[in-house]
Swiss-Prot record:
InterPro entries in alphabetical order: Beta-lactam/transpept-like, Peptidase_S13, Rv3627c-like_N
Keyword terms: Carboxypeptidase, Cell wall biogenesis/degradation, Hydrolase, Protease, Signal
PANTHER family to which the protein is assigned, alphabetical: D-ALANYL-D-ALANINE CARBOXYPEPTIDASE, PENICILLIN-SENSITIVE CARBOXYPEPTIDASE A
Domain of life assignment: Bacteria
EC number of this enzyme: 3.4.16.-
Alphabetical list of Gene3D superfamilies matching this protein: DD-peptidase/beta-lactamase superfamily
Annotated protein name in UniProt: Carboxypeptidase Rv3627c
Range of residues in the leader sequence: 1-28
Organism per entry: Mycobacterium tuberculosis (strain ATCC 25618 / H37Rv)
Miscellaneous comment in the UniProt entry for this protein: Overexpression in M.smegmatis leads to elongated cells and promotes the formation of increased numbers of Z-rings.
Function description: Carboxypeptidase that cleaves terminal D-alanine from peptidoglycan in the mycobacterial cell wall. May cleave L-Lys-D-Ala and/or D-Ala-D-Ala peptide bonds. Exerts important effects on mycobacterial cell morphology and cell division.
Amino acid sequence: MGPTRWRKSTHVVVGAAVLAFVAVVVAAAALVTTGGHRAGVRAPAPPPRPPTVKAGVVPVADTAATPSAAGVTAALAVVAADPDLGKLAGRITDALTGQELWQRLDDVPLVPASTNKILTAAAALLTLDRQARISTRVVAGGQNPQGPVVLVGAGDPTLSAAPPGQDTWYHGAARIGDLVEQIRRSGVTPTAVQVDASAFSGPTMAPGWDPADIDNGDIAPIEAAMIDAGRIQPTTVNSRRSRTPALDAGRELAKALGLDPAAVTIASAPAGARQLAVVQSAPLIQRLSQMMNASDNVMAECIGREVAVAINRPQSFSGAVDAVTSRLNTAHIDTAGAALVDSSGLSLDNRLTARTLDATMQAAAGPDQPALRPLLDLLPIAGGSGTLGERFLDAATDQGPAGWLRAKTGSLTAINSLVGVLTDRSGRVLTFAFISNEAGPNGRNAMDALATKLWFCGCTT
């Protein structure tokens, strides 16, 4: 039922009543204000003072007390001796001054696990525009108005086959459907789909990767064309991954075009081929955030290759590693002892020192490398987001550093790492890097206890 309509006469009556009421109010006001105050009528009370608003975000003070090296060493002595930490390497630094406050085996290369992604993110921030996007194209496979079309991948693993309006794992992902619409407007009638994944070179699996991790949802073969980073179930974080991601991307395009997906092949696009369609990934800064918060291995490998191509290195595992370490060295971040085989940290063959990891964080938090400052915002928040969302929430410690600590986590079998920045209870900003190899069954909890103790420390003596 629609709203009741008022008749014209109703409007007239109501309008007259309103005018009469206004006239009475005006007359009453005149009696009070023009003829002096009537007996028994009080003057209006003064308006209340505006409330004082406290800032929601307050910058840390440069004058906050710096912990002493002796105080930090004494405070961490017991927790750092926990046998569940196994072989522990670590370093703690004052963010503002760069002063080293604590170290243990900080120059000994150990398996860093996913904290390796800190180096990948740092190199990307130093090399690429934060708004950089990756283009996935479709070109004509020949000169005829009917014929094959070629899906040309450039390293965007987030391309999705989901229809418009349907969620995908990656926010802002490009869609196969948009490619199809453009192809249909191009005047070309596709008869087959081919996939050009030649932008990437070398092996698709890094040394030290376990093929079982494909089924476990940790990784997929790294190819220049992919759908949902190879996920079989696009919106499930630990979905089993495809072993043929480039072919799968072509098959999804073929299905959307009404062609036989089984007929999709791998082929190089003809030189100078006519572009029929193009879509773009989300901006780099958004993809970095997804990589760091979800510890996304496929994303890390593809971003490593973005750094590689930007400084004329091959888009391969070795090319990306060389590009990342070279870029950090150019920024005066010491990578001595680094021996890496991937950009994600998934391989057990990777080696990094706590010194390199902490130096990267100190560069981001300190005053000398403003291009790295966004790295701090990319880190998960203790008790709040990403891989730290469920950590540091122990009620017995009043939640400790929850909200005060941001860090990248790392976890492999018997390996734990935690690298980041915190504001201690004295208001001082500290950077830290902890790597634990040969860890015991409670190794992760022991590492959290180490970081919590540092936050509580305030060790000025």
